[in-house]
């Protein structure tokens, strides 16, 4: 696929989501492709055919990324709506949804967001610490200020945007590892309960930190202009964490299930076999932590479904991403979305 075709697919996807083509797809209704530049109708297509094309292209290439831009603008921070700001696009992974372009003061903005991710696998170690999330938000505020102070003139638009809104993105990793540590299956009501509990806690503490820092250091200019007491315009964003999850001891990435219970990690230093530590602990208890067993798991793409010495409950706990009903990922995403003021980078795993 050419770069032009990829670009066209991304534009179609954004227009498609903005005007809710998915509602019309079930009825084979006509769908207008509307230019975001001037609002003119460039073409009318069958909604179902467009949806099918998007799904097939995404399955084959991983693209286009789908962003609900109408929802993003409707749910942006209240003071940004009052200022008439608009989100036109996201970053590549689609978790950063900040205003760009000419703002209400006639200045051009380039979005800037400082990110950090909490390790949910270690939830029990930090959730009771009242200062923990506030300290992280202070750290992000300091990083943002350092960027504002030191950014070169060539980054004037980004520097201006960072100064005006001071947006940060607190995210997570290790959700599936936490569930496995607690012997909880991903496809379970208890996983749903933990998902809600964790994000309600993180969101509430991030909101508290924004107020505390606004009182201590002053609200960001965008908020101050409308009388809002917020240090950060945006506070949360669920970003992919493939690399930092490895740094954090191999915890599960982001909010997603693990792809395999054993895999080969290739680095510049060589190739290393990585095993799921919670599964290894279970196998050891059953006296099954052997090379033959692990090789059989590896041969089956990291799945334990074939191991007859595991109970159905144990197999459910160690299901891999492609074995899990993807509707659970969508349900969890919907449940946590009210607590996230930017967006979630969410992958679906379709075999």
What is the predicted function of each stretch?
Residues 1-351:
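Long, C-terminal-biased catalytic regions of enzyme "large/alpha" subunits
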């Amino acid at each position: 696929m050419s770069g032009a075709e990829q670009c066209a697919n991304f534009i179609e996807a954004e227009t498609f989501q903005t005007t809710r083509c998915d509602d019309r797809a079930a009825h084979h209704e006509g769908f207008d492709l509307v230019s975001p530049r001037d609002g003119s109708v460039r073409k009318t297509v069958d909604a179902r055919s467009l949806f099918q094309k998007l799904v097939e292209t995404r399955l084959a290439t991983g693209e286009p990324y789908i962003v609900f831009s109408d929802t993003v603008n409707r749910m942006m921070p209240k003071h940004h709506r009052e200022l008439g700001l608009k989100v036109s696009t996201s970053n590549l992974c689609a978790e950063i949804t900040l205003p760009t372009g000419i703002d209400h003061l006639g200045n051009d903005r380039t979005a800037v967001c400082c990110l950090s991710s909490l390790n949910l696998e270690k939830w029990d170690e930090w959730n009771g610490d009242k200062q923990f999330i506030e300290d992280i938000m202070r750290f992000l505020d300091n990083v943002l200020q350092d960027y504002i102070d030191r950014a070169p003139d060539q980054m004037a638009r980004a520097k201006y945007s960072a100064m005006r809104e001071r947006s940060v993105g607190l995210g997570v990793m290790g959700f599936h590892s936490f569930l496995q540590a607690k012997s909880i299956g991903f496809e379970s009501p208890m996983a749903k309960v933990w998902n809600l509990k964790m994000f309600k806690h993180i969101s509430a503490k991030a909101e508290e930190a924004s107020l505390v820092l606004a009182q201590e250091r002053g609200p960001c200019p965008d908020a101050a202009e409308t009388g809002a007491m917020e240090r950060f315009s945006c506070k949360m964003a669920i970003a992919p964490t493939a690399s930092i999850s490895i740094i954090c001891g191999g915890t599960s990435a982001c909010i997603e299930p693990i792809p395999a219970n054993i895999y080969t990690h290739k680095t510049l230093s060589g190739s290393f076999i990585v095993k799921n530590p919670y599964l290894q602990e279970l196998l050891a208890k059953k006296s099954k932590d052997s090379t033959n067993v692990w090789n059989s798991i590896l041969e089956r793409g990291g799945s334990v479904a074939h191991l007859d010495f595991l109970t159905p409950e144990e197999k459910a706990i160690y299901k891999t991403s492609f074995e899990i009903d993807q509707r659970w990922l969508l349900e969890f995403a919907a449940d946590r979305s009210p607590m996230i003021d930017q967006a979630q980078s969410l992958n679906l795993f379709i075999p």
